[in-house]
Structure formats: structure tokens, C-alpha cells
């Protein structure tokens, strides 16, 4: 409540900052921090899409549309509980019937096995990305704490500027106290914003998801290469 009242006072009783300023480092880091903080939901949506595309979206709709052209409704239900990889594995398993050509059966068997492995690799990818989504959720709380410290820094700057503008020698002790509070708050806030941005923050999440995606696609290629 005290901070809220202070923010109201700062809006009503505006001052021109002549003697105090945030450092260039602070302003540069804050610019990046705010950009990333404001795009966290987009990042989460993007990761969620990577985790779920095999169960829905335009890719699955196209597959179902193609199947509907050649399959009955009961046949469609055969694929309804499968992801696109498992679904294609089932299609290929149907080509391993003993009354089919041996060459077709062999291709069907190998391809079915490959896509079953791809489906398992995707499940692993999804599980690992799920942990990154949990990191993003915890980062929302970190952003709230960081924004609170940013507000504190603004308040200290405001109070320091007013104390300096009073030009009263008797206020020098208060000026020194507020100067220390302001500088310490700036330092803490920069550190918190850098943590949010860097390897322990959003950059780390994006890097790990990228690496997980590389690993998944490499495993997929290996599985398909074995069908040759």
C-alpha cells in the first residue's frame, strides 16, 4: 500500500530529473528485459505448438482429410487416438499382411517400426519441453519480483532527486543515504534482469528447446535411414 501511494504521488507531483539518472547499462538491459518479458506468452505458445502439432492443427487436419477421401468412418476412428507418427505406423503395419507381396511387407514392417520410434522420440521431446514450460511459469514469478525491484529503483531515484533539488546542506546525510539506496537498487535490478534474460532465464529455455528439437529430428532421420 505504501508503494502504491508513492507511485500515485510520483504521478501527481512530477519532477524534472536534473541530478539523477539510470546508468546506460541499466537502460540497455531493461530494454531487452521488457521485450523478452512481454513476449513470454508467445514463447510458451510456440513451445506448446511444438509439443502438440502431431495431435492436431493443420497437419493432422490434412491427414484426416486425405484419409476421409479413401476411408470409411469406422476406418477413420482407427487413427483418432494416434499421433501422426503412430497413425502412419499403423497404416504401414496393415501392409505386412501375409497375402501381400514380400517386398511390400518388408517396406511396411520397416516403415512402421521407424514411425513407432519417431513417435516415442516425440513423446520424449514433449516430456522434456514440458519441463521447460515449468521453467517459463516460474519465470513469470521472477518477472514480478524483478518488476517490483524496478519500481523500488524508480522510487529511490525520485526521492533522491527531490532531496538534491532541495539544495539544503542539512539534507546531505539524506542525500547520501538515498544515493546508496538508489545505486544498490540499480545494481540488484540489473542482476535480476540479466538472470531473467540469460542462460538461467529465457535464453536458456530457448537454447534447450532448440537442442531438444535438433535431437528429435536427428533421431527421426536415423529411424528413417534404417528403412533403406
Swiss-Prot record:
It comes from the Eukaryota. Keywords: Glycoprotein, Sporulation. Glycans are attached at residue 117. Its main location: other. The keyword Glycoprotein applies. One of its GO terms (cellular component) is spore wall. InterPro entries: AH/BAR_dom_sf. GO terms for biological process: sporulation resulting in formation of a cellular spore. It is found in: Spore wall. Belongs to the SWP12 family. This is Spore wall protein 12. It comes from Nosema bombycis (strain CQ1 / CVCC 102059) (Microsporidian parasite). The gene is SWP12.
Amino acid at each position: 500500500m505504501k508503494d502504491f501511494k508513492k507511485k500515485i504521488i510520483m504521478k501527481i507531483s512530477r519532477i524534472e530529473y536534473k541530478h539523477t539518472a539510470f546508468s546506460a547499462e541499466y537502460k540497455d538491459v531493461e530494454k531487452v528485459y521488457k521485450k523478452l518479458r512481454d513476449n513470454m506468452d508467445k514463447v510458451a505458445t510456440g513451445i506448446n505448438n511444438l509439443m502438440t502439432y502431431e495431435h492436431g492443427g493443420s497437419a493432422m487436419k490434412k491427414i484426416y482429410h486425405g484419409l476421409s477421401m479413401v476411408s470409411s468412418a469406422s476406418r477413420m476412428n482407427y487413427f483418432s487416438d494416434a499421433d501422426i507418427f503412430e497413425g502412419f505406423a499403423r497404416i504401414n503395419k496393415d501392409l505386412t499382411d501375409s497375402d501381400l507381396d514380400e517386398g511390400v511387407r518388408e517396406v511396411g514392417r520397416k516403415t512402421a517400426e521407424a514411425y513407432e520410434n519417431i513417435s516415442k522420440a516425440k513423446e520424449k521431446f514433449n516430456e522434456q519441453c514440458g519441463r521447460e514450460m515449468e521453467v517459463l511459469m516460474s519465470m513469470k514469478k521472477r518477472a514480478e519480483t524483478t518488476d517490483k525491484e524496478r519500481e523500488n529503483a524508480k522510487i529511490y531515484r525520485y526521492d533522491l532527486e527531490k532531496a538534491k533539488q532541495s539544495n539544503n546542506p542539512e539534507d546531505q546525510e539524506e542525500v547520501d543515504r538515498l544515493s546508496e539506496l538508489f545505486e544498490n537498487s540499480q545494481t540488484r535490478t540489473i542482476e535480476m534482469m540479466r538472470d531473467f534474460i540469460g542462460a538461467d532465464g529465457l535464453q536458456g529455455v530457448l537454447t534447450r528447446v532448440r537442442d531438444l528439437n535438433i535431437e528429435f529430428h536427428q533421431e527421426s532421420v536415423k529411424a528413417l535411414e534404417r528403412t533403406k
